[in-house]
Amino acid sequence: MKFIVKPHPEVFVKSDSVRKRFIRILESNLRSIIQRETKGVEVINRRDHIEVTGLSDEYRDVTLAVLTQTPGIHHVLEVKQSGFKDMHDIFEQCLEMNREVIEGKTFCVRVKRRGNHDFTSIELERYVGGGLNQSVESASVRLKNPEVTVKFEVANDKLNLIIARHKGLGGFPLGTQEDVLSLISGGFDSGVSSYLHIKRGSKVHYLFFNLGGPAHEIGVKQVSHFLWKKYGSSAKVKFISVDFDPVVAEILEKVDDGQMGVILKRMFMRAGGMVAEKFGIEGLVTGEALGQVSSQTLTNLRHIDNVTDSLILRPLINWDKEDIIDLAREIGTEDFAKTMPEYCGVISKKPTVKAVKEKLEKEEAKFDFSVLEQAVYNARVMDIRDIEKESQEQAPEVEMVSELGSDVVVLDIRSAEEEDEKPLELDGVEVTHIPFFKLATKFGDLDQSKEYLLYCERGVMSRLQALLLIENGYKNVKVYRP
C-alpha cells in the first residue's frame, strides 16, 4: 500500500520557511491520526509531497479515508511503486497494468519526472505510448480528450504507476491558521460554517447556547463530535455549553417583542466574545446568511456586531440555503440538522428587519446583565474528546450487551451510507436499519413487547440515542457492543 499526498497548491505560493512549516504541520496531523487508527503505516515528509506506506493493504480503506478528509491536501495518488532499468522496462510495467484498461479505447500517456535520467519526459511519453499502441491492437492514441489517460511518475530511481487519483479536501493544514470559536446550534448553517473553517486550517472550538434542554445539547454534541472526528481529530478543541434559559427568560420578561430577535443575537455575541477572550480566541464563526431571517439584514447584523470586539466571521453570508444543504449532505451533517430543533426562531412574533440603535439600547437598559454574566460564568467547558466518555457516564443505566439471544432485535442506527459499506449481518438475529435521525419518531411504532439493542460503529451514537429513549420512558432499550 502506498499513497503520494500532494499538498494544496496555495501552500506552494508561500515563502520557503512558511511552506516547510505548513507541510511539517500536515505531516504531523496525518501521523497523529494514522497512528491512532492503524498499525504499521508510515508517514514520510518528502519536502514537496508526503508519502504514506504500509506493508499490506489491511488498512488501505481507513488510511484513504483519513487522507481525503484531512485539510490541506489537494489530491492523493494511490500508486504501485517499483524500480526500473530503462525506458523499455517502464513500458513493460505500464503494459502489464494498463493492457485491459485501454483495450478498445483511445488513450494518451502523461508523465511527471524528477531527477537525472538519460531521457526527457516527452521522450518517455512517446516511447511508452508507442509501445502500448503497438501491443494493444484495439487501442488507439488520441492526445486530446482521450477516453483513458495513462499516468505515472518517475522520481529518481523509482517508478510510481498510478492506480487511482483521489480528490482531497483542499484548504490549509489544520493549525496553520488561528483558532476560532463556532457558535453552533446543530442546524445546517452552523455545521457547514464550522466545516469551512476547519478546511481553511483553523482549529474550531464549539460554543453552544442551550435553549432546549438536555435533548438539544446531546444533539449538538453529536454533530460537533462528528465534525471533529471526521475532519479535525488531529486537534485538541473545546466544547463549551452555556445554559441560556435564564437569559431568554429575562428577554421575554423585559424586552419589547419586536426587538427580541436582534437583542438575543446581541446577547449571543456578547457571551461569545467573553468566552473567546477567556481562551485567547480572536474570531467568532456563525452560520448567518444575508436576508435568511429577520435578524440577518445588513442593518441588524451591524447592530449585532457592535456589541463585541471579537472578529465575527460569516463564511455563508452570500450562500443560498439550497447550496448550504447540499454541502451539509456532502460532508455528512445533513442527517443531524434534519432533526435538530430550531429554538431561536420562536422568540419574536413580529421581528424588526431594520432595528434602530436607540431603541435597542433603550430595551437593553431594562435587561439585568448580571444574568448574562452568570450564565457565562457557569459555562461548562469540556475537551471534545470527552464527549464519548461522557456518553458512557451520562447513561450508566443503559446496559451494554455483547452476546445476543434469539428473542432480541438489533437496531442498526448508522446512516444509510455506513450501513451500505459495512452491512451488519447476525446469524439467527433480526437486524433492522433505522438511521439515528429517525429513531425518535420511529421507535414508538415498533413492537414494544420486544427488546431492542442499538448498534453503531463506535458505540457513541448508540449510547446517546439510548439515553434519549430512556428519558422518554422506553425501558426496552440496550446497546449492542460486539
Swiss-Prot record:
Keywords: ATP-binding, Cytoplasm, Disulfide bond, Nucleotide-binding, Redox-active center, RNA-binding, Thiamine biosynthesis, Transferase, tRNA-binding. Belongs to the ThiI family. Disulfide bonds join 344-456. Its main location: cytoplasm. Gene3D superfamilies: 3.30.2130.30, HUPs, Rhodanese-like domain. The keyword Transferase applies. This is tRNA sulfurtransferase. It comes from the Bacteria. Its EC number is 2.8.1.4. PANTHER family: TRNA SULFURTRANSFERASE (PTHR43209:SF1). One of its GO terms (biological process) is thiamine diphosphate biosynthetic process. Transmembrane segments: none annotated. The active site is at residue 456. One of its GO terms (cellular component) is cytosol. It is found in: Cytoplasm. ATP binds at residues 183-184, 265, 287, 296. It catalyses: [ThiI sulfur-carrier protein]-S-sulfanyl-L-cysteine + a uridine in tRNA + 2 reduced [2Fe-2S]-[ferredoxin] + ATP + H(+) = [ThiI sulfur-carrier protein]-L-cysteine + a 4-thiouridine in tRNA + 2 oxidized [2Fe-2S]-[ferredoxin] + AMP + diphosphate; [ThiS sulfur-carrier protein]-C-terminal Gly-Gly-AMP + S-sulfanyl-L-cysteinyl-[cysteine desulfurase] + AH2 = [ThiS sulfur-carrier protein]-C-terminal-Gly-aminoethanethioate + L-cysteinyl-[cysteine desulfurase] + A + AMP + 2 H(+). Pathway: Cofactor biosynthesis; thiamine diphosphate biosynthesis. CDD domains: PPase_ThiI (cd01712), RHOD (cd00158), THUMP_ThiI (cd11716). InterPro entries: Rhodanese-like_dom (IPR001763), Rhodanese-like_dom_sf (IPR036873), Rossmann-like_a/b/a_fold (IPR014729), ThiI_AANH (IPR020536), ThiI_N (IPR049961), THII_Thiazole_biosynth_dom (IPR026340), THUMP_dom (IPR004114), THUMP_ThiI (IPR049962). Residues 61-165 form the THUMP domain. GO terms for molecular function: ATP binding; CCA tRNA nucleotidyltransferase activity; tRNA binding; tRNA-uracil-4 sulfurtransferase activity.
